Structure formats: C-alpha cells, structure tokens
C-alpha cells in the first residue's frame, strides 16, 4: 500500500479562478494507488467556498450530499481546470480507507494512522482534534469546547454541542463594572466541554480503545513539534508590553524554556500537557472532570478570581441539537443550528442560489465574488440575533424564518451589482459584530460513509491567559 499523500488546498487554488479562496488546512488521504490526477469532489469545493464566507464565524459545520447520478457542478457551467499537467502540483487517488483534514499535517497524519489501524472516522477525529490542541494551543485545546456534526453511514445526522457552559455562580450583570474580567482571568472561563464531546463521539461511534486514539497527541506533546509561523504570529500578538510567555514561569516552561521565546523552526515540547493527556488516556475522560486534573484547574481559576467549582465540572454534559438543512442547486447541505451559526451559512448559500450565473465564466469571477461578499454582509446582520435556544425565546422560529424563500428573495432584492451599501442596510439594529479571533476545523470521513465535521476553540487567542501550572491546560475565555 502506498503511503498517504498530504494535499494542501493551496495546490488547487492557483489552477482556477477560485484562487481567491485561501486555506491552510492539510488533508491526509489513505489510499492504495496514485494513478489518477487529483480531482476535488464537490464535497470538498463547497466547504472551501463556505470557508471564504465564514472564516470568522464560529462553528461553521457543513456536510454536503448529492444524488448518486448527479454530475451537476454546483457553480453552474464554469468548471475550473483542476487537471493542469504541472508536475509541481499534488495528485492523489480517492482514499480507500478515508481522509482527514485539519489545519496541521501532523494532526491530519495522526488521523490517517488511526484509520490504518482499523479505526473509523470517529476514532480519527478524536486523535486529530487532541493533536490540534497540542500544536495549535493558541486557539484550541481541552480547556475549551466546540460543536460537531455527524453523518452516519445510513445518512442520519446528529449535532453534538460540547460548547463551554457558564459556572453555576455566574449572573447576568457580573461584568458590568469590570468588562475586562470577561476576557482575562478566572471569571472569563466557561466550563470546558471538549473532552466530554470527544467522549460522546467515541463511545457512540468509535471502534478502537479510547487510550489508542489519545496516544498520538500524547506522543506529539512529549516528543515535540516544530514551531510554525502561526504560533510565532500569535505569540507576538498576545505578548504585549509584558511578555507573559517569558516572565510568567507557568508559561515559560513551554514557550521560553531557555529564557527567550521559541523561534520559528525550534522544537516545542509540552510535557505537562502530555502527562495530562496520558492520564485521560489511561483513566478515561472522567479524569478531566474530577480528581487531580479538575482540582488543579479549579485552583488556578479561583486564584485568578474565578468562581468555577468542582461541581461545575462534574455536572457538565453535552447537548444534542437539531440540524439545519437546505437544498442547494440539487445538493442537500446539512449544518448545525443555534447556538452555532450554521443556519447563517445556509442562508448565504440560498441567497447565492438565486444567481443562476454565479461563477459561470472566468469573466464573472469579480462580480460573483462581490455577490458573495454582499450575501455575507446580510448574513452577519442576521447572525447578531442568534443565541442559545435554552435562554433565547423563539430561536427555532427565527432560524426557520431565516431560510424561508420570502426572506431569501427580500435579501436578494437589496443586493446591487454595482455598489456596497451603508452598514445600516445590512444590520438595521446597529449591533457591532466584532472580529472573532479564531477556531480550528477538522473533518474526518471513512469508507463506511461515516463523516464528522468538528469546530473547536478556546475563543480568543490563548483564551483567558490562564494556564493551569500543574497540567499545562490553557483555559478558554468563552464567557466573553
């Protein structure tokens, strides 16, 4: 069997007018031969378009399906040439075992290795997501949470909400006199859900032992990984005038082991985090929510004025949400519902569907891009009203109304091909939509048809700036 090829979406970008779409994700594909040229399927192209639309939207999760006999290209008659004979471009056959896509090639490879060991997409996703928390700790990790969309081999769907929840002591006006407390320190952290979310996924869908799928991340944290450009950039962004990476001993152990911050290409190890993951691998997910790991987490948060308790950790449970679904140019697209923004992504696609000539020719690329931009602006306006269905009245009604044809047609009528509009046109309520700092997205599929799309985050870069000294866990600031 040939070794899996690592394919970056950048290998595809420069071959077509879709080169406006940028992605750093790395895709590992497990296959048996490489005789065919790489032909991206529509299921790869649509998430790429959505990534352009919603790079800043948290929890964008889409799974696309289409009729078996459908040869329809979803962007009409203009088909980009992905078959350039340039020898420098990657080529690969469709995977025989499946495929895993994450932001880091090491983590994608961990997922494929799990597939090769007899695991399925659920096992692979757990391995890759935990790895991302090791390497891309600036925006993801077990101190945070996320949302998953699962498509089973029999084409049923499930949304797993493992977002952080507010501690029991939280109250409505707790940040009224200190808004920074929602961003930095112990009060900024919600109860982490990532481990419970991965536990739910693995126990319901996985086939390999839990310890087996956790071990790759343990080894990556212990043996080390190269410092990349993203980590350098985010350290520079977060350090500020007082460089806590070097001056705070808790952080310096990992980020400045020699007294100065790590540089590009250096090998970074996270031994405390490796020990933490190893304990979770050996004793199970509950080791995160009780015992030493939980106790040290609560101590660290309370030392930074937090109110989270062991009871908050022990009482955490995942939530199962409804799916959102549309038909788009003959394809069925499934996404998540509130509190994530899946319905907004679908709304944008429905607006774009009204343009029959979207990307029809190379000459229409600029106009089509403008239309996408305008649809996104209106989408962001509607996004400001989304909230947690448990605490926001009539959220299901709002989501369903967002996708009715009359709403789509009304939005289309407001879009001009010749200009943009005043901000009030997109968001009449005048609510400010701040830039969202970043999340990590992973997709895993296997040869049974099981497909899982997951978005995880600790919210802002380096979360609440609270690291648990004993475990190396970086806590989220999701209360913001």
Task: Please give the residue ranges for each predicted region.
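A short acidic/small-residue loop/turn micro-motif
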Residues: 165, 459-461
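Short, low-complexity, Lys/Arg-enriched N-terminal segments of secretory-pathway carbohydrate enzymes
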Residues: 1-45
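Internal maturation/activation junctions in enzymes
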Residues: 78-79, 357-458, 471
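N-terminal signal-anchor transmembrane helix specifying type II single-pass membrane topology
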Residues: 30-69
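Flexible, polar/acidic helix-loop-strand segments at domain edges
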Residues: 343
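Noncatalytic scaffold domains of N-terminal-nucleophile
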Residues: 51-52, 63-283, 288-340, 413-419
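A short, polar/charged loop-to-alpha-helix boundary motif
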Residues: 170, 461-476
């Amino acid at each position: 069997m040939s070794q899996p090829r690592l394919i970056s979406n950048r290998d595809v970008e420069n071959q077509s007018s879709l080169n406006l779409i940028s992605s750093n994700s790395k895709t590992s594909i497990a296959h048996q031969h490489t005789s065919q040229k790489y032909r991206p399927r529509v299921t790869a192209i649509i998430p790429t378009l959505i990534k352009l639309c919603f790079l800043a939207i948290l929890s964008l999760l889409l799974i696309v399906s289409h009729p078996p006999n459908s040869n329809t290209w979803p962007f009409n008659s203009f088909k980009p040439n992905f078959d350039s004979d340039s020898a420098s471009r990657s080529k690969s056959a469709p995977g025989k075992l499946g495929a895993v896509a994450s932001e880091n090639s090491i983590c994608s490879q961990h997922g494929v290795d799990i597939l090769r060991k007899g695991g399925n997409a659920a096992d692979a996703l757990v391995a890759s997501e935990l790895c991302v928390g090791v390497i891309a700790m600036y925006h993801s990790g077990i101190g945070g949470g996320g949302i998953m969309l699962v498509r089973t081999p029999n084409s049923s769907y499930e949304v797993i909400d493992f977002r952080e929840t507010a501690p029991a002591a939280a109250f409505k006006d707790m940040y009224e006199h200190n808004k920074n407390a929602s961003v930095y320190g112990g009060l900024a952290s919600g109860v982490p859900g990532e481990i419970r979310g991965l536990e739910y996924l693995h126990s319901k869908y996985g086939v390999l032992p839990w310890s087996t799928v956790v071990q790759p991340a343990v080894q990556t944290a212990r043996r080390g990984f190269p410092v990349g450009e993203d980590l350098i950039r985010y350290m520079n962004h977060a350090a500020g005038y007082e460089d806590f990476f070097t001056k705070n001993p808790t952080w310096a152990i990992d980020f400045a082991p020699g007294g100065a911050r790590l540089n590009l290409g250096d090998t970074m190890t996270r031994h405390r985090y490796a020990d933490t993951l190893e304990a979770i691998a050996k004793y199970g997910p509950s080791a995160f929510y009780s015992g030493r790991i939980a106790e040290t987490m609560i101590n660290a948060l309370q030392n930074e004025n937090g109110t989270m308790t062991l009871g908050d950790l022990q009482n955490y449970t995942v939530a199962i949400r409804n799916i959102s679904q549309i038909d788009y140019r003959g394809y069925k697209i499934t996404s998540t519902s509130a509190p994530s923004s899946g319905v907004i992504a679908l709304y944008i696609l429905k607006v774009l569907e009204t343009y029959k000539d979207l990307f029809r020719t190379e000459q229409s690329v600029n106009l089509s891009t403008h239309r996408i931009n305008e649809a996104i602006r209106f989408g962001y306006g509607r996004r400001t009203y989304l909230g947690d269905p448990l605490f926001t009245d009539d959220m299901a009604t709002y989501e369903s109304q967002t996708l009715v044809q009359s709403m789509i047609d009304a939005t289309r009528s407001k879009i001009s091909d010749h200009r943009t509009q005043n901000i009030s046109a997109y968001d009449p309520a005048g609510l400010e939509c701040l830039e969202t700092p970043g999340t990590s997205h992973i997709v895993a599929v296997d040869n049974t048809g099981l497909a899982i799309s997951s978005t995880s985050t600790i919210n802002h870069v380096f979360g609440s700036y609270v690291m648990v000294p004993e475990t190396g866990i970086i806590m989220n600031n999701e209360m913001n």
